[in-house]
């Protein structure tokens, strides 16, 4: 860090009582808030998508979200918020949110709650379901990191990026370049939220 101060170091720390030590003593720039905001939002989503008998006190959104930001206090800017990564099941998979259209409520919380950065996992912005049955991983709601694999939604997204059509945020233009209608609508809504979070000073800087 002393030699290359521009390098950003992110750590996975799953014990919340160690958050402060890893930021203030060890010196990481950001920590995955997996055990905090991610787990809180996941319980809310799963309870609403599939009533699995979870006790009501564990999934009430206002209570859980409030409890997490109060715990973090001045550590909030050092968290890395996310809804998907290589370890967790895809939001739109049958094992989590079941439908990419359900992503927006937790997305808005992750983006707008504080000034912490937000990580986008590839394909999340088009609602990739992660339901392919890959060789090693199998159908587990994740995009494999162990197999030589091709993801159809990513192929379609790449075509849109290469053509420049993504700049329009127009579903009709995106479908012309090969996206499905659902992917195009998810992408536009997702991009609008990210653009707002990165441009509005009240959200970006908390002022």
Predicted regions mapped to residue ranges:
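Aromatic-lined glycan-binding groove of carbohydrate-active enzymes
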Residues: 28, 53-88
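Intrinsic-disorder-associated interaction segments
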Residues: 34, 51-58, 72, 179, ...
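Conserved N-terminal glycine/acidic-rich loop preference
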Residues: 16-37
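Active-site cleft segment of glycoside hydrolase catalytic domains centered on the general acid/base Glu
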Residues: 1
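A general structural signal for short secondary-structure junctions and capping/turn motifs
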Residues: 20-22, 69-74, 109-113, 136-137
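Short, well-ordered coil/turn segments that N-cap beta-strands
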Residues: 4-8, 26-30, 75-80, 114-118
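Extracellular glycoside hydrolase catalytic/binding regions
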Residues: 30-56, 96-98
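Loop/helix patches that line or flank the sugar-binding groove of alpha-linked glycan CAZymes
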Residues: 8, 14-15, 39, 53, ...
